[in-house]
């Protein structure tokens, strides 16, 4: 079990459009993620620690590949046009999480610029598993020199919302591939994994946090596992892992800290206290503190 908390830095504020008396973070100052680092297992004599200093927040590269042309003919994707970073944090089954993260990384590292069919020419970004017009048409089509011009056609193609959709797709594909081995409710519970995405939108330059909660439902074809995506508002936190145990208290600390200039610090201090005082062997030190603001990332640790 794990405790992960993610929130927006509180350096700048704007008026809440739904309240004339409240200010909320402007979501332009970066995000922070806190995670314990203990991996434990249940034994006949109780829960025992297996590994400490386990990474539960992973930096994932986002690469958009641009099309290469020989004269007016498409000739594959040979060069990365744009790179960005995001954080993926997980709580739950480490095996399922590794499968999910591999799937997310595989998708986000192979995004490709394509064109949308229609009257007006328009470039779009596609997942590697999407239908791709350039690849489909191959060298049978000719493209004029006035299109696929990076300076005018490749700007503002990658949004945080698009990345969040790719992550959602990747999680669901990973869960779907594991369901063939799930034979009973115990096996289903064992694969439960929740995910947090933190990314600064390359277009808006605003910060976005998303939480993906593990869910399942019964259909005519059996049980389906999937993720339920939620956008985290400016004055909220994303909490996964031992949310049912510590979530309420952490949210109370966060609410009280909104009016201070020590929002991240107060939350970090309280989370550290929770981890230090936990006697279940489900969470443990050190605590990783990671931040992301655009493509700038930092990390530090609380070891005692």
Give the ranges of each region predicted by the language model.
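N-terminal nucleophile
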Residues: 1-304
């Amino acid at each position: 079990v794990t405790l992960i908390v993610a929130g927006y830095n509180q350096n700048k504020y704007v008026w809440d459009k739904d309240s004339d008396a409240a200010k909320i973070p402007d979501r332009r100052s970066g995000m922070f993620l806190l995670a314990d680092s203990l991996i434990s297992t249940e034994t006949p004599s109780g829960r025992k620690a297996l590994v400490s200093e386990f990474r539960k927040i992973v930096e994932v590269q986002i690469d958009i590949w641009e099309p290469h042309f020989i004269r007016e003919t498409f000739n594959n994707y040979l060069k990365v046009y744009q790179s960005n970073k995001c954080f993926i944090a997980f709580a739950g089954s480490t095996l399922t999480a590794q499968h999910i993260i591999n799937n997310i990384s595989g998708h986000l590292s192979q995004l490709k610029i394509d064109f949308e069919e229609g009257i007006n020419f328009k470039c779009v970004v596609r997942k590697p598993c999407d239908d791709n017009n350039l690849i489909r048409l191959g060298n049978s089509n000719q493209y004029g020199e006035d299109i696929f011009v990076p300076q005018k056609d490749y700007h503002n193609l990658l949004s945080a919302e698009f990345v969040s959709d790719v992550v959602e797709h990747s999680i669901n594909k990973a869960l779907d591939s594991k369901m063939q081995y799930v034979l009973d409710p115990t096996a289903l519970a064992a694969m439960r994994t929740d995910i947090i995405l933190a990314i600064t939108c390359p277009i808006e330059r605003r910060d976005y946090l998303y939480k993906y909660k593990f869910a399942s439902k019964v259909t005519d074809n059996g049980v389906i596992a999937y993720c339920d995506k939620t956008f985290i508002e400016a004055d909220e936190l994303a909490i996964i892992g031992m949310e049912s145990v510590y979530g309420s208290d952490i949210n109370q600390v966060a609410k009280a800290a909104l009016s201070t200039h020590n929002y991240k610090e107060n939350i970090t201090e309280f989370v550290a206290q929770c981890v230090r005082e936990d006697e279940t062997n489900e969470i443990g030190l050190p605590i990783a503190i990671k931040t992301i603001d655009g493509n700038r990332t930092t990390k530090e640790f609380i070891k005692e």
